[in-house]
A protein has these predicted regions:
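Membrane-proximal, non-catalytic sensory/regulatory domains of signal-transducing membrane proteins
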Residues: 47-61, 86-119
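Sec/Tat signal peptide C-region and signal peptidase I cleavage site
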Residues: 13-23
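Amphipathic coiled-coil signal-relay and dimerization helices
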Residues: 68-74
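Absolute protein N-terminus
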Residues: 1, 23-24
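Short hydrophobic beta-strand segments that form the core of ligand-binding sensory/regulatory domains
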Residues: 122-127
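Bacterial N-terminal signal peptides that target proteins for export
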Residues: 1-8
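Extracytoplasmic/periplasmic sensor domains and loops in membrane signaling proteins
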Residues: 27-43, 74-102
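Juxtamembrane segments flanking the first transmembrane helix
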Residues: 24-59, 65
Length: 127
């Protein structure tokens, strides 16, 4: 009985810790996107954030409202509408205040925080 109780305790603690890390990751993703939106609205361009598209584990992507990808690890210069319409439909729900969206990308469920800039760019990142 003690072994069973110990296993349950370890499982519960593991889930609690994973949830804490998960919340911290969501906060980091949101902060990163918010900082980039503020920088773009302060005069930076999407091209200034090309290095952010290479960061792991949560790369940043920036696209125009029409779906043209400006910053992304592999889709730069392509239309997200043509490459992945469901992903485009999700990220195009970006608001000036930011919102979390879900979509499927390469058979995996994705969650992304997306915000729109005053000039209509969409900045996002997720897991």
């Amino acid at each position: 009985m003690k072994k069973y109780a110990l296993m349950v305790l370890v499982l519960v603690m593991g889930l609690a810790l994973a949830g804490g890390v998960f919340a911290a990751d969501k906060d980091a993703i949101k902060s990163q996107v918010d900082e980039i939106v503020a920088a773009i609205e302060g005069g930076k361009t999407a091209a200034d954030f090309k290095d952010a598209a290479k960061k792991e584990p949560y790369y940043v992507y920036i696209l125009q409202e029409d779906g043209m990808v400006l910053v992304h690890p592999s889709l730069e210069g392509k239309s997200l509408k043509e490459a992945a319409m469901p992903a485009y439909e999700a990220v195009s729900k970006a608001t000036p205040d930011g919102t979390w969206v879900q979509y499927t990308w390469k058979d995996a469920e994705k969650n992304a925080y997306v915000r729109s800039t005053k000039d209509g760019l969409i900045v996002g990142s997720g897991y």
